[in-house]
Amino acid sequence: MATQTVEDSSRPGPRQTRVGNLLKPLNSEYGKVAPGWGTTPFMGVAMALFAVFLSIILEIYNSSVLLDGILMN
């Protein structure tokens, strides 16, 4: 058999810590999806701006428009 399950009833549960108790409310929404589009439009705008940024960097790297008078090796 490739996988094997071990049943051990003597295994303790998760350990309680102060930090864990402080962070537990932050994890209570895990797995829930807000209805509607949510922040999708903002992500689209961010992706478009990032694409513009990459194209500007590519133009500078290729010395196509902005660096016509400067010689590069």
Curated annotation (Swiss-Prot):
GO terms for biological process: photosynthesis; protein stabilization. HAMAP family: PSII_PsbH (MF_00752). The chain crosses the membrane at residues 41-61. Disulfide bonds: none annotated. One of its GO terms (cellular component) is photosystem II. Pfam families: PsbH (PF00737). One of the components of the core complex of photosystem II (PSII), required for its stability and/or assembly. PSII is a light-driven water:plastoquinone oxidoreductase that uses light energy to abstract electrons from H(2)O, generating O(2) and a proton gradient subsequently used for ATP formation. It consists of a core antenna complex that captures photons, and an electron transfer chain that converts photonic excitation into a charge separation. The modification Phosphothreonine is found at T3, T5. It is a single-pass membrane protein. Residues 1-21 are annotated as: Disordered. Phosphorylation is a light-dependent reaction catalyzed by a membrane-bound kinase; phosphorylation occurs on Thr residue(s) in the N-terminus of the protein. It is found in: Plastid, Chloroplast thylakoid membrane. Belongs to the PsbH family. One of its GO terms (molecular function) is phosphate ion binding. PSII is composed of 1 copy each of membrane proteins PsbA, PsbB, PsbC, PsbD, PsbE, PsbF, PsbH, PsbI, PsbJ, PsbK, PsbL, PsbM, PsbT, PsbX, PsbY, PsbZ, Psb30/Ycf12, at least 3 peripheral proteins of the oxygen-evolving complex and a large number of cofactors. It forms dimeric complexes. Its main location: plastid. This is Photosystem II reaction center protein H. Keywords: Chloroplast, Membrane, Phosphoprotein, Photosynthesis, Photosystem II, Plastid, Thylakoid, Transmembrane, Transmembrane helix. Signal peptide: none annotated.
